[in-house]
């Protein structure tokens, strides 16, 4: 720094001044120098104080200059950094800064990946919903078909029962009408005075005979009952129906305390059974509910159906354990 160079020059100058009288002095001049040494020492002390003061002032000036330069540099650096930050902010706002573009590119890439994944997931969800809808439609159709078959069997059995009763009533009406006509004819003959039967002599019966003490209506009722029994069991023309009905009722099925007894075996809720119907393939199902006159079960496809105990008794359906 300039201060140190000046100090070096002044120190060298003082050394030269101190060494100069030693080089030029002689033995004869030593006495004169001793006499003048006192005055020179006073002058040198005054010069040292002035130099120190002058140097101190120079140092203070130099320090103030350095502080001023440092402050200027600091302000300049602050302004430069502020301008750089403003420029970077403008680049970010304009979308041109690399610090902004690189994370933005990563975000856009992640957005594209997530959008693609969301699209695939949406397609899978739509396909799943469609399959579930088709499955429910199929189950509803199968349930409807099973209910239609059960309804058809029920109506058919009821109609067959009604036909049987009508046949019995028809036979009984025929018998009753015949007997009633006979009774009317006999009464007319009794009232007719010119009837040839009255001229006949009473028939003499030999041996044991039966005397009927009943009224004609009582005899007619008894005869009707006998003819009904003969129509249901005796005559040859009724035998095919009887054999068919015997075949239909050859199975034993009843419901007791929430369980089903069928052909000597017990069935309960939650058991898996095999349902067999004529002219159809057997299917497996799980019993869900057992009522007094019907049994509900669930098929493998989720559809629910019911069997009437009367259908099991008639042999239209048969079940067994799996």
Swiss-Prot record:
SMART domains: Sds3. Pfam families: Sds3. Residues 17-51 have a biased composition (Acidic residues). It comes from the Eukaryota. Residues 1-16 have a biased composition (Basic and acidic residues). InterPro entries: Sds3. Keywords: Coiled coil, Nucleus, Repressor, Transcription, Transcription regulation. Signal peptide: none annotated. Residues 1-56 are annotated as: Disordered. Residues 50-82, 147-178 form a coiled coil. The keyword Transmembrane does not apply. It is found in: Nucleus. One of its GO terms (cellular component) is nucleoplasm. Belongs to the BRMS1 family. Involved in the histone deacetylase (HDAC1)-dependent transcriptional repression activity. This is Breast cancer metastasis-suppressor 1-like protein. It comes from Xenopus tropicalis (Western clawed frog).
């Amino acid at each position: 720094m300039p201060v140190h160079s000046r100090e070096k020059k002044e120190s060298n100058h003082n050394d030269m001044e101190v060494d100069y009288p030693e080089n030029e002095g002689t033995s004869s001049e030593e006495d004169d120098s001793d006499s003048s040494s006192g005055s020179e020492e006073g002058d040198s002390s005054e010069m040292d104080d002035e130099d120190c003061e002058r140097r101190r002032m120079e140092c203070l000036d130099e320090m103030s200059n350095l502080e001023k330069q440092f402050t200027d540099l600091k302000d300049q650096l602050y302004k430069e950094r502020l301008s750089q930050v403003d420029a970077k902010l403008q680049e970010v706002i304009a979308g041109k800064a690399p610090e902004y573009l690189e994370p933005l590119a990563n975000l856009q890439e992640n957005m594209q990946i997530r959008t693609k994944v969301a699209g695939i997931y949406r397609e899978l969800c739509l396909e799943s919903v469609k399959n579930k809808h088709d499955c429910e439609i199929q189950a509803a159709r199968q349930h409807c078909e099973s209910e239609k078959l059960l309804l058809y069997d029920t109506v058919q059995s009821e109609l067959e029962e009604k036909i049987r009763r009508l046949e019995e009533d028809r036979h009984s009406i025929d018998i009753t009408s015949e007997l009633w006509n006979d009774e009317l004819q006999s009464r007319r003959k009794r009232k007719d005075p010119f009837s040839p039967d009255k001229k006949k002599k009473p028939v003499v019966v030999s041996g044991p005979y039966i005397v009927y003490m009943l009224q004609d209506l009582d005899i007619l009722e008894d005869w009707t009952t006998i003819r009904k029994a003969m129509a249901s069991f005796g005559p040859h023309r009724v035998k095919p129906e009887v054999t068919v009905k015997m075949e239909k009722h050859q199975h034993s099925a009843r419901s007791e305390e929430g369980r089903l007894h069928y052909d000597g075996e017990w069935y309960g809720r939650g058991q898996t059974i095999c349902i067999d119907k004529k002219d159809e393939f057997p299917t497996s199902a799980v019993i869900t509910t057992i009522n007094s006159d019907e049994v509900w079960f669930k098929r493998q496809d989720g559809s629910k159906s019911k069997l009437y105990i009367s259908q099991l008794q008639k042999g239209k359906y048969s079940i067994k354990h799996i």
